[in-house]
């Protein structure tokens, strides 16, 4: 759960955090008994706890398909991300990955921590994949093949232009959007979304991750991962790694703001995609990551800490997003809130200020025109008073102690 200091600063985070903790424990108890499916769902919770929670709400067949789709692409991404693997070894693997998923003897040791376990024990994923219906398998194979080919192209090529950037993000994330749309359609729950809208859903998430993960990627050993396009960063520095040096702080923030402004291009498509969804579980599955993305961009914008350490939404705010996101009205309200937060940070002296403000105002107009911005809704940007009396602190301590005792008493004996 969130740290005590964060909870005391934001006490209204407590209930959503409690609900999230209970939901996480419930999800862990829902892991299937079959060995290959048990491995897959267990691994899903390890590589993405929040994704693992949201996926549990999908119908059984679709849930299984999305779980395997995610793990297959996570494994493919693990190969691509491992900078210790030579190009000569890496390219053939990613190119043939769509074939490996049919081979329950195949595995390839790479990555670290839980990702290494995923790769070493990949036969479990293959066995689960083979259990899926044919329409699900065909969709997963097709997207894996196309993604592997795209990754192979950019293993041998740098991201030079904004077009390159969009193409790379299409291969590694836009295709995920296309694949999920195919799975939703195959389940019978949704109409097939257009490729353009599906692609934008993936690009918005991927560009947010690329922005947020600058420092981690540039410091990767033995070789940096560089995804920011030269067409953008070369306006501010001579080399991409120069952005992390303190003497370039001013230019670094301007470059960061340029990158965020580029990512905002996809928001209108994302709102349209989500507004077309009919199934409540699929809607939540799609909407929660998009809200996390706009929230992360609001935190990153004009924030030098992107080049100094980790910038991410606090766990309590994440819990609120998961708890409150149920309808399209919730999405419009949240996008409006975070776009207001972002807008308040725009410096009129920033070289891209006019463009940034124009894109934010377009987003806000869509949200306002939706009719969802009622006075009764809860805002994400109204901060709580930071000072609390000792009685409230004592009460929170007691509640936390009771909760800890309850959860501890219900832990499985093996833990």
Curated annotation (Swiss-Prot):
**Which cofactors are named for this entry?**
Mg(2+); Mn(2+)
Q: Tell me yes or no: is Cytoplasm among this UniProt entry's keywords.
A: no
Catalyzed reactions: 2 (2E,6E)-farnesyl diphosphate + NADH + H(+) = squalene + 2 diphosphate + NAD(+); 2 (2E,6E)-farnesyl diphosphate + NADPH + H(+) = squalene + 2 diphosphate + NADP(+)
Per the UniProt entry, what are the Gene Ontology biological process annotations, in alphabetical order? Answer: farnesyl diphosphate metabolic process; isoprenoid biosynthetic process; response to jasmonic acid
Its Enzyme Commission number(s) read 2.5.1.21
GO molecular function annotation: squalene synthase [NAD(P)H] activity
Q: What class of enzyme is it?
A: transferase
In what pathway does it function?
Terpene metabolism; lanosterol biosynthesis; lanosterol from farnesyl diphosphate: step 1/3
GO cellular component terms given for this protein: endoplasmic reticulum membrane
Instruction: List the membrane topology term(s).
Output: Multi-pass membrane protein
- Where can this protein be found? Endoplasmic reticulum membrane
**What is this protein called in UniProt?**
Squalene synthase 3
Q: Which organism is it from?
A: Panax ginseng
Organism taxonomic ancestry = Eukaryota, Viridiplantae, Streptophyta, Embryophyta, Tracheophyta
